[in-house]
Amino acid sequence: MTDPFDPSAFLSTCSGRPGVYRMFDSDTRLLYVGKAKNLKSRLASYFRKTGLAPKTAALVGRIAQIETTITANETEALLLEQTLIKEWRPPYNILLRDDKSYPYVFLSDGEFPRFSIHRGAKKQKGKYFGPYPSAGAIRESLSLLQKTFMVRQCEDSYYKNRTRPCLQYQIKRCKAPCVGLVEAEVYAEDVRHSVMFLEGRSNALTDELSAGMEQAASTLDFEKAAELRDQISLLRRVQDQQSMEGGSGDVDVVAAFVNPGGACVHLISVRGGRVLGSKNFFPQVGIEEEVAEVMSAFLGQYFLSSPERDLPSELIVNVVHEDFPALIAAIQELRGRELSISHRVRGTRARWQQLAVTNAEQALSARLANRQHVAARFEALAEVLNLDEPPQRLECYDISHSSGEATVASCVVFGPEGPLKSDYRRYNIEGVTAGDDYAAMHQALTRRFSKLKDGEGKLPDILLVDGGKGQLSMARDVLNELAVPDLILLGVAKGATRKTGFETLYLNDAAHEFTLKGDSPALHLIQQIRDEAHRFAITGHRARRGKTRRTSTLEDVAGVGPKRRRDLLKHFGGLQELSRASIEEIAKAPGISKKLAELIYANLHSE
């Protein structure tokens, strides 16, 4: 048996220098990561007899081991702390759930470059603008660029194989550089103006366009003057919508709000006085978490764990924390740029601050209301199934295909707080008879629950299968084959009328059949999860089917293997454009002889 943790013995050998500490339980699971200016003093504070917060007391009660790492200074300790939190995600740390890469606007190289949304590593040659707080904010900007400057946004493979202008030209969203309807110099000017807008230099851009309009009018080029007038009008309209009153420079306004049910951090991004967008974050927090702790943890994880994120020149926050000086120093050292942080602000900045606080409060209230709604449905389901307590994890499976083609199985997961989308899975089904839903479900469940033997994944409390007695029986067989610990099986079959609200339910085996009233919260939960599984399955199936059909018509052509199929489709920009091409045009594609072009053409046009 492991000896109990002795705080006095540990503290007697603990250093008083800056560093990072890691707390483990008796199973050597990492519970918490922290940093300190003085390790000995900070760790001693955990073991005082009174005054500990409930969360801290619960943490201390589980400590079996503490490890420390001494660092050169507090800044280095903070950077190491954020690295460890991101890697291990300890349960007692405040965790920022949203860690996806943020989107950028990407401007490609070339004579007629395109604007597009980009996520991930910046490997392509070109220019990047952002990051933006959401993809929606980027789509707004790209839409404006199309309307105002008519710059292209189509894929290069599509652009290179156009023989006539597309619909975007007809509706005045593109100048059709693909077919030479705009000179390179004119297009380059449109791109330069677009870049000025994305860089937040809207006022300078408007002044430049106004001067150009006056110049065009003075030379009686009224068509050009009218075009510039329309561009100025659009830009001013957007400036009115997106500008922060009295705003200039690059500012992030961050407000944290906490109540007993959770926490929300609302961030408003202002660049060049223009609002790029805003976003809500819902960190994973413990009971009775202080709002200042939430703010400090958020800023550290947001700016230190993801160095690619854009750094403003100023942060406006609604609370202060004693760690802010060290935090700002660490951010500046990591980024090599100056950053100021403000709390007591007046005038316009105070209104920005209050706006962020209001948004955080409202977002958390809406989230908690929805959580309570879902939690109430889970409680109702527990009552219907005679469970001692509500289930914590419910998985639902569904199958989608088109007459056996491109079969996909889906797995969606719900908890009392709603859908757990990071746990969703899709399974491409292979090697079963086309249209055999039982075999497809058998394969999906086998693949899912086989991983439990390897210690991967969590066991659900309830397994929901979209289907009747047959699917339920098959699911039970899979669980028995894999010796999966007993769990509740629930089958959902459409009733005699096949209308929503008249479903027949099967519990654990086909003999236990029952129905619920149409207004039952438990039935509503079952319907919600089943419909989500169906949606997730059918979107996966459609994507797989589309990918298959793009290549299937070429698969029977001798001499056209997978690589050549990909190259052909990339060269022509898709199967539709390839189908329109003549034999001579196909023969011009790299690696395609005249004879092979004839075979491809014949295959594409055979009845």
UniProtKB/Swiss-Prot annotation:
Record PROSITE patterns: GIY_YIG, UVR, UVRC
GO molecular function, one term: DNA binding
SUPFAM superfamilies in the cross-refs: C-terminal UvrC-binding domain of UvrB (SSF46600), GIY-YIG endonuclease (SSF82771), RuvA domain 2-like (SSF47781)
GO BP term (any one): nucleotide-excision repair
One Pfam entry name: UvrC_RNaseH_dom
Membership in a protein family: Belongs to the UvrC family.
The name this protein goes by in its record: UvrABC system protein C
Gene, per the UniProt record: uvrC
